[in-house]
Amino acid sequence: MTELTSKELGLISDALTAEGLLCKKARAYSKTVTDVDLSSTLTKIADEHEQRYNALLGLIGG
């Protein structure tokens, strides 16, 4: 595997921050809404963001 440049690491770090925040927000919203279907959709969205977060983390060996 090739080494990542500092710019690439910075971009991945920014993406990790964004994905983590989106995951947390979607999970929080899924617990506060009263509509069951909307809650389920928000949970799925949170899961997708968590998967992307983990994939990005894997890029930097975390």
Language model: regions and residue ranges:
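His/Met- and acidic-residue-enriched segments that coordinate or traffic transition-metal cofactors
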Residues: M1-G62
